[in-house]
Amino acid sequence: MDRNRLRHEVAQRFADVLKQDSRALSLLQLLADDAHAAGPADRAHWSGPFAALAEDAAHLRGIDAPQDSVGIWERDAATGDFVRAQRHVDLWRFCANVERIGKKGTRKRIAWLGESVARGFFFDPAYAPAQVLEQQLSALGEPVEVVDLAQSNCDPWWLAHVAASTPLLEADAVVVFAGNNWRLGELAGSAPEPYVVDGELIEAEHGFARILERQHRKLDALAAQVVGRLADVTIGAGIPLVLVVPEINVADWINCPAGTLDVPPLSAGDTQRWVDAYDDARRALDRQAYADAEERIRLAIALDGGTSSASLDLLGRALRGQGRRMDDAYRTLRQSRDVIDDTRIVPSVFANVADTIRRVGAERGAHIVDLPRVFAERTGDPLPGRRLFLDYCHHTAEGIRLATTATAQTLLPLLFERDAPFDALLAAAPSPEREQEGWAHLLAGIHNAHWGQEAELCSHHFREAGQAAPEIADDAIRQVYDAYRGRTTPSLVPAFDKLSANPIAETYLVGFGVLSRNAFREAPLLAALTDAFPALGEHSPDPDYTLGELATLDLLDAHWSDLKDRNRWYRRAYRAAYALASSFTFVAAAPRALSIALTCRIPDARHADRVALELNGQAIGAADVGSAWTSLRFEVPAHAVVHGINQLSIRWPNVPHDDRRAQLRRDFEAGARIDIRTHFAHLHHLTLSTAA
């Protein structure tokens, strides 16, 4: 085994260790405290995030510009061209499908860098922002070449590494459209000081709010460092730098998955009061009493200190409903997206990171394209949502065209000393073909469902897919339903082969999609598909796990766990409930009597209270449960069970809990991964069985 292959094997095994044990990363960081910057020979074998690992540990000190590569493309000594390297084959799917970057010709050359938004995620590889920008500039300026170096999953250190190579391309300008992946590691990091300070704050009143402030200050420093590095390697080399400040889906995206709450640990009475205030506000919002909802939810926010995405999101919706307070609604919804949570890593630019890009970029001489301002001005809507975004941060075709138009308007005077009206540049921006737009919405529907978004938003994207391209409604929608409804891994189902024959679908489903069907619950995805296309309801959404054909169903199996379930992040012998209701969907072959067995507890409850079960909205039993594990069994008559989809709900009591912050602090200071959200119940066992 040669040296590079050996290193690759070690890197792969080390990556597996990091995935299995978060403390291994902290150990690595401790060992790297005195690390020196690696030279080109030392880092040549790394790829993607690993390519930046030495730079990360060394904090970008003394990194020399690479002499023989631009991202995944390496110089061909015979021709001088940059050729896609075989050793980076694992990254090809994240980059432009370009085999060779030739020598610069007579046209002006722009290097286009960024993350998945800059790649045109959901449209990739058929419709790319770099292609749109090239056509716009060529139409109203002179013929140009835009070299697409954008890479999905690109971290800030790898971005700086690629930017440092742009002088090799003789670029006339560099555009960096990034910021959504600029984030920190786990809570403490590597140094002892954060363990002491953060540990004290975990136990303090409103300590989590102060921890969040500390994390945001660290993000400020990170963003300033990255922007400074980008300016050093571009402006420092005499190349104009354009920084595109990203925007996110403020109106429609929710960071806290539907049906859950992210309540930080509070005192016993405060947790109870928080839940009461939240429930009151939710009911007021449902009846469109927006001012009342605002008043109620502010009580909850006063208790959590602004560290709950759920409470901030509800406040933002209440402000939005009042109509006259859109600026307040924007700031509040934006704040809800910026709550840092290790178990909910949503690619999106933090508001303070965007501010730092603007400020430091301008100070260093970069030209700023401010997409939040552009989107608000061009759409007349201060709350960008599904019109411009397909998920948390990736754009619709309109969003792409507006972003590249603003970028082109900035580049024209830099490259050609001329200006052009925004509308003229927008008119020159090509649109995707209707089939491409349909596929983008179809994949977005899958993605939103997997990320715990509300059913209405997922159904919206599926309907948009069918309207954009009716042939998708005829074939691809059914293929998605068939691929994801069975026990078999989707990639082994014939329908999946048909889906991935489309290049857009292949890029997402094979490159990014979750392929293991049995690993998590697909009921929300299948329900959203059926809502958009009711004819699908004729087919069972769970043919391999049907009660009646199987004698027993274990509802705590991964098959009934959402992809974004926080429980997946922790090694424990129970499933925690993060809301006062836990819902489970199952399919029954026919109405017949069944038995429900469960073992549960209300952790740290001061006293026992009523746990109630409902099946399809009908009460089927209740019992008192406290802090001790309690085993229960309920017999359900046949008339309560329906043929097809059934909904089991368990409602947990809102009782006072002992304050667990002192224990969390001890666990944290001992190096354990701690769960900083309130558990309303623990489930150790939950099965359904047909009556004997």
Regions found by a protein language model. Give the residues of each.
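N-terminal secretory targeting modules
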Residues: 1-110, 123-124, 138, 142, ...
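Membrane-embedded segments
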Residues: 104-170
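Long, contiguous interaction/recruitment modules in multidomain scaffold/adaptor proteins
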Residues: 169, 173-272, 353-433, 490-491, ...
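Extracellular and analogous surface-interaction loops
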Residues: 582-594, 635-641
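Short, surface-exposed beta-strand/strand-loop-strand elements in extracellular ectodomains
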Residues: 608-618
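Extracellular carbohydrate recognition and processing domains
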Residues: 620-640
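Noncatalytic modules at the cell exterior or secretory-pathway interfaces
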Residues: 638-651
